[in-house]
Regions:
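A residue-level marker of the well-folded mature domains of exported/periplasmic proteins
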Residues: 1-198
Length: 198
């Protein structure tokens, strides 16, 4: 590294949305669906991670041959209560959805709560989140959240330490590409969720 340059340690935010989109596309194909209605809950508008997570989920569906109609798309600003209120209002519109994509687990949990307190009180379509928080993983395990995508804080910490030590020693850092040390996200489903529960 030259003086003044920095190293980024983290996950390419597009990979989170790609995991969500690929997961849903597989489900839709198994059900014989090629055109679906999607509700999308985003984090705070204008943030880089929100833009990338949202766009990459849409692109993954499209790349898998799924025509998605975004019948609802709004920010709930990462907030469970806002997502719950907005989805409860949306359900009152009579519009149907085949899946709900959320930029984080908290909003996904809000959508699930709205489903469980309205109508027939069931989670009537897949709801997907990002972060694999403790409560998110619990929802995946019980089957109310279809999947989440794990952000590995331990791997981020280890990567940061590895890069810092390498820079101090003037050594080449394995895994560093163009000043970017990537942490690969992991899809969390009912099949592997026990590996992520603390």
């Amino acid at each position: 590294l030259k003086d003044g340059e920095v190293v980024y340690v983290g996950t390419d935010e597009t990979l989170y949305g790609t995991e969500q989109g690929n997961y849903l596309a597989k489900l839709f194909k198994e059900d014989g669906k090629t055109e679906v209605n999607i509700a999308m809950f985003t984090g705070t508008l204008g943030l880089d991670n929100v833009t990338k997570r949202t766009a990459s989920a849409k692109k993954a569906l499209e790349d898998n041959g799924i025509k998605a109609n975004y019948v609802f798309e709004n920010t709930a600003e990462w907030d469970r209560g806002k997502a719950m209120d907005q989805f409860a209002q949306f359900m009152g519109s009579g519009e149907t959805v085949d899946a709900v994509i959320c930029n984080n687990d908290e909003m996904a949990l809000g959508v699930i709560e709205a489903m469980l307190t309205n109508g027939d009180k069931t989670v009537f379509c897949p709801v997907v989140g990002i972060d694999a928080t403790d409560v998110g993983c619990a929802a995946v395990k019980e089957g109310t959240m279809a999947c989440s995508v794990f952000q590995d804080p331990v791997a981020q910490g280890e990567g940061t330490l590895k890069c810092a030590l390498g820079l101090l020693k003037g050594e080449e850092i394995e895994g560093l590409v163009d000043n970017y040390y990537n942490i690969t996200p992991q899809l969390v489903t009912k099949e592997n969720v026990d590996n992520f529960i603390k």
